[in-house]
Amino acid sequence: MPRRSRYDDDEERLPEGMTRVGYDADTGVYTFQDSDGSYWEGASGSRYGQLTRVGHELAGEDDDAQPFLPSNAHAGPKVSWRHELMPLLNFGVIIGVALLLLWWYLHVAAGPDKGSAQDCPSGTKPYTIHQGDTCWDIAESHSVGVDDILTLNPELDCDKLSIGSQICLKD
């Protein structure tokens, strides 16, 4: 890449009809002359940028006292702080939805306690499963067969007995 760009020339950077006529090394200010003969100065330390008119008396209707190039401060409407924080709001909504989904998942995973209120038919009684119980041990302790337990509890899986759940047994 060359050291000089084609946009470093005055004719590319300055408004039409403007020429650079001087430079004050003490203040670092460039002076320019317009096609109508008026003089303009740039900002201190800036080669190009906002130009202000100098060296003449202002007439009542003359609005040349305004900067030649508009500044960026007046370029657009003032942006609200709410508009500036909009990406943060989007992030907050994403976090909120994630927490809501987590709460829903934990609520569903916990589920209702299926064995706490077992309704057993007449002639049977509920039995709460304790740690270490097996279908065989329950059948032996209540003098019934394993087939009788499975008949009264069709959804029972003897390999997966849940501690605290209830099953129905004959009296």
Swiss-Prot record:
Gene deletion effect: Does not affect virulence to host insects.
InterPro entries for the chain: LysM_dom, LysM_dom_sf
Pfam families: LysM
UniProt KW keywords: Virulence
Reported function: Might have a role in sequestration of chitin oligosaccharides (breakdown products of fungal cell walls that are released during invasion and act as triggers of host immunity) to dampen host defense.
Induction: Expressed during in vivo infection of insect hosts.
Other facts: In plants, chitin acts as a microbe-associated molecular pattern (MAMP) that is recognized by lysin motif (LysM)-containing plant cell surface-localized pattern recognition receptors (PRRs) that activate a plethora of downstream immune responses.
Identification of the protein by name: Secreted LysM effector Blys4
